[in-house]
């Protein structure tokens, strides 16, 4: 029983085939072309190579990537890979691949992967966070992604930093056209900008920049707890590798939660940067063996 998935990222595209136990039967990567049509062709070539490695044909493909298609028009919106916006990306992928495609936001793929057999396995409601070049959130409920009526559930990175201090208002300009989005405060580049040095070096120093980061991330996640109250929060993306977050974030979240108690686990994604392609593969039921 084989599933095929693609993680369409800003710098790389990865295609993979997984067996029923979630083990890789094929895995291949290539750079992300900046051109729309070249991106479609890159996905076609990577799926063909994954099929060759797995010795199986993909009857359908799950795709995870930035943004999401509008339920009203089918056109992409909210993608930081801006060449996708206002284009019928899922439909064009179906045309190029010649088979059905399911597309989901990459944060929803993270949530699905981790809820299935990762750090969120066994929890009913999983809120998964990407803290990388960009910032996003995804929700899985009872092992299935929650998209919402407008297919924007979990778009946490483009909500404002809660309870901003005077020096944080109105906040840095965001590519989406607003100011003060959480992405501009808790992404990897935002942390590096605030620290005045590379994110890894600043995290290793464990100084004021990291304290500010934990405070801002805690405020942002407290709003999620008040609205969704997930059973677990799973962190992915480059900043999830900062080990100090897991000791400090609960204390950064708790004062802002509208409750006298807060005990939600904050865990690191088990599958790391494989979660995107794994979650994309899990978007479809398994395919029978050839």
What is the role of each PLM region?
Residues 1-61, 70-73, 90-101, 114-123, ...:
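ATP-binding/phosphotransfer module of carbohydrate and carboxylate kinases, centering on a glycine-rich
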Residues 7, 62-66, 104, 128-134, ...:
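Short beta-strand segments
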Residues 27-29, 79, 148:
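Residue-level detector of high-confidence beta-strand sites
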Residues 103-107, 111:
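Short loop/edge segments at beta-strand edges and connector loops
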């Amino acid at each position: 029983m084989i599933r095929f998935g693609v993680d369409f990222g800003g710098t790389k595209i990865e295609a993979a085939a997984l067996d029923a136990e979630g083990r890789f039967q094929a895995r291949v990567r290539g750079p992300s072309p900046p051109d729309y049509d070249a991106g479609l062709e890159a996905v076609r070539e990577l799926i063909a190579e994954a099929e060759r490695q797995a010795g199986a044909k993909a009857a359908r493909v799950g795709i995870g990537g930035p943004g999401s298609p509008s339920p009203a028009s089918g056109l992409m919106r909210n993608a930081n890979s801006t060449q996708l916006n206002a284009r019928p990306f899922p439909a064009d992928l179906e045309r190029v691949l010649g088979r059905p495609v399911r597309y989901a936001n990459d944060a929803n793929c993270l949530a699905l992967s981790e809820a299935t057999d990762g750090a969120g396995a066994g929890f009913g409601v999983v809120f998964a966070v990407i803290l990388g070049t960009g910032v996003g959130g995804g929700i899985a409920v009872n092992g299935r992604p929650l998209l919402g009526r407008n297919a924007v559930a979990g778009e946490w990175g483009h909500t404002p930093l809660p309870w901003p201090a005077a020096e944080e208002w109105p906040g840095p300009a965001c590519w989406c056209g607003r100011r003060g989005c959480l992405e501009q405060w808790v992404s990897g580049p935002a942390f590096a900008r605030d620290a005045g040095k590379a994110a890894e070096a600043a995290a290793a120093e464990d100084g004021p920049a990291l304290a500010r980061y934990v405070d801002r991330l805690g405020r942002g996640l407290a709003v999620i707890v008040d609205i969704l109250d997930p059973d677990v929060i799973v962190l992915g993306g480059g900043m999830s590798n900062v080990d100090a977050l897991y000791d400090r974030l609960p204390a950064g979240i708790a004062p802002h939660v509208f409750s006298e108690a807060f005990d939600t686990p904050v865990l690191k994604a088990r599958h790391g940067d494989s979660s995107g392609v794994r979650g994309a593969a899990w978007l479809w039921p398994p395919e029978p063996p050839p």
